[in-house]
């Protein structure tokens, strides 16, 4: 899916951001702008600015869909910008994974104009400009070098009930501040010896505005700039300036950055007054982050799961990471559909996991080819079927899409059926296979159970039946014998034997990390079960990330990591119904 398309569905849930953009378009807030080359700029430019210090998760997917989706819908553009200002935690591995995730979700930052530069940026590309702008703030008397330790700065900042106290270095002269800042840049000081702070208001009710740090010393190798810099700008300084440099119109953040918006405006307004930027400036808007039940998205918690081998890695199909849900079999379209359904609001709320699973289920129901898989096999022997013989049966690839054609598979004397489809002593209302009862083999014949084989412990190891030759599905005699039960099967000598991983929710508590609980206590011991299954023979040719509905079971995907040619491994993506609903 390209960034020019969106999944078909009912109208999207409410999105207050659209109202803001509509108002800006109506008043011409960002009309008539041009870039440095004189080319006209779109009236809507958004950006997705991840820090490359980990793998993206489902919450990031919402932000990606919001930013890229709005740009798409308003014929604008969205930039992918890496906020790579912390060299200690960042790595090109994460850069590559984020690029792959955005592309996989169906979006692109490439300009629609032929020959134009793709809008992929790094905050580190602006380090020279950021440094220059920091000096501009010093020269205007609104930034100073503070020589207190981080602990001292924190102690002097105050709290919600007490105002902060000014640093003893707050009134250094412009000349001294410039000298110290340049010496910081030149590597004359150790980490933590000095910081550059904005001079705003140590009594501000908003603690963010109590002389926030703009630059800190960090002698560390950067993944792009190497050892050129030993001072690095803070997020709040970098973010707004990067937006202005890139001509962003609507800077969309989650609610935790709401208190940072005054600082965003403060930096840009001071640089505008210094002649660096001009009106209209970018504006920051906040929307509610995605809180999903039965999941955690804390990077620290997810890392703990990986480090303690509670999961197999960042791409474990039970993880909420984009690489995890992709491996689980979720589709990009289902994620976009989910984000459209939950909408964008100003207030935090919890979205039930069933909403996400429902979007995945609806998307796959419309597209996934059908197939048969026996996950808990029990041998069924048709005693009156000729030995060594087989015949073809057929079924639609998709019952609602005849244009997808039909699939053909063999029936023989020995079959595999689901163990739960036989019961020697059935309860009332059980219409599947039991001694003396008739059922239909789906797409095949009506059969009558005649007996069982048992092992020394009395366990049923095989079921015997006779088939009724005139009752094959699709023939004139198909309805000659009425039965209530219908079971699926695969031919034993022809079946594709495969490993199938039955995944479920990683946690059995809807809020595993709430109220001081140890989230590890909420791990679901049934979140992964591995079985050896017997599948319709055609599944032997399944390629990685091919998706199917296993009839009566759910939706499955050929694992993109472990599947081999002729030997696929399947992951359960989601069941046919919500098994967690009350």
UniProtKB/Swiss-Prot annotation:
Monomer. Belongs to the class-I aminoacyl-tRNA synthetase family. ATP binds at residues 51-53, 57-63, 254, 289-290. This is Glutamine--tRNA ligase. L-glutamine binds at residues 83, 235. It is found in: Cytoplasm. It comes from the Bacteria. Its EC number is 6.1.1.18. Its main location: cytoplasm. Gene3D superfamilies: HUPs (3.40.50.620), Ribosomal Protein L25, Chain P (2.40.240.10). One of its GO terms (cellular component) is cytosol.
């Amino acid at each position: 899916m390209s960034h020019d398309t969106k999944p078909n569905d009912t109208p999207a849930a409410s999105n207050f951001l659209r109202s803001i953009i509509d108002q800006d378009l109506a008043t011409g807030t960002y009309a008539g702008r041009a870039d440095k080359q004189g080319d006209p700029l779109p009236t809507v430019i958004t950006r997705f600015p991840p820090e490359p210090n980990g793998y993206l998760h489902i919450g990031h997917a919402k932000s990606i869909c919001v930013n890229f989706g709005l740009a798409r819908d308003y014929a604008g553009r969205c930039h992918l910008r890496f906020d790579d200002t912390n060299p200690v935690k960042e790595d090109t591995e994460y850069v590559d994974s984020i690029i792959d995730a955005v592309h996989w979700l169906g979006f692109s930052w490439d300009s629609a104009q032929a020959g134009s530069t793709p809008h992929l940026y790094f905050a580190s590309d602006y380090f020279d400009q950021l440094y220059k702008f920091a000096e501009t703030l010093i020269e205007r008397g609104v930034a100073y070098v503070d020589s207190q330790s981080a602990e001292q700065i924190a102690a002097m900042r105050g709290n919600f009930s007490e105002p902060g106290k000014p640093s003893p270095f707050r009134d250094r002269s412009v000349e001294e501040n410039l000298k110290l800042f340049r010496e910081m840049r030149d590597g004359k000081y150790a980490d933590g010896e000095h910081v550059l702070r904005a001079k705003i208001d140590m009594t501000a009710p908003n603690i963010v505005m109590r002389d926030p740090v703009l630059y800190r010393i960090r002698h560390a190798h950067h993944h792009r700039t190497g050892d050129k810099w030993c001072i690095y700008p803070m997020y709040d300084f970098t973010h707004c300036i990067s937006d202005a440099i890139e001509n962003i119109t609507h800077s969309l953040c989650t609610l935790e950055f709401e208190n940072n918006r005054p600082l965003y405006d403060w930096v840009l307004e001071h640089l505008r007054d210094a002649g660096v930027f001009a009106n209209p400036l970018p504006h920051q808007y906040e929307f509610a982050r995605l809180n999903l039940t039965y999941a955690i998205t804390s990077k620290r918690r997810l890392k703990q799961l990986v480090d303690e081998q509670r999961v197999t890695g960042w791409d474990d199909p039970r993880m909420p990471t984009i690489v995890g849900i992709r491996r689980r079999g979720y589709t990009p379209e289902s994620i976009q559909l989910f984000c459209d359904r939950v909408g964008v609001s100003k207030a935090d709320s919890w979205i039930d996991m069933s909403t996400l699973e429902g979007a995945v289920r609806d998307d796959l129901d419309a597209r996934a080819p059908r197939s048969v898989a026996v996950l808990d096999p029990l041998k069924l022997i048709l005693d009156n079927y000729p030995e060594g013989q087989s015949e073809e049966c057929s079924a639609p690839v998709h019952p609602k899409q005849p244009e997808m054609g039909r699939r053909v598979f063999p029936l023989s004397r020995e079959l595999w059926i689901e163990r739960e489809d036989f019961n020697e002593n059935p309860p009332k209302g059980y219409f599947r296979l039991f001694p003396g009862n008739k059922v239909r083999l789906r797409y095949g014949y009506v059969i009558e159970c005649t007996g069982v084989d048992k092992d020394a412990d009395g366990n049923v190891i095989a079921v015997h039946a006779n088939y009724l030759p005139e009752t094959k599905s699709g023939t004139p005699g198909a309805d000659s014998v009425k039965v209530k039960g219908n079971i699926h099967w695969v031919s034993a000598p022809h079946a594709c034997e495969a490993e199938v991983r039955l995944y479920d929710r990683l946690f059995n508590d809807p809020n595993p990390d709430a109220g001081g609980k140890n989230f590890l206590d909420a791990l679901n011991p049934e979140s992964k079960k591995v079985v050896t299954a017997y599948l319709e023979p055609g599944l032997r040719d399944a390629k990685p990330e091919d998706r199917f509905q296993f009839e009566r079971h759910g939706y499955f995907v050929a694992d993109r990591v472990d599947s081999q040619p002729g030997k696929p491994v399947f992951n359960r993506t989601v069941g046919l119904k919500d098994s967690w609903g009350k």
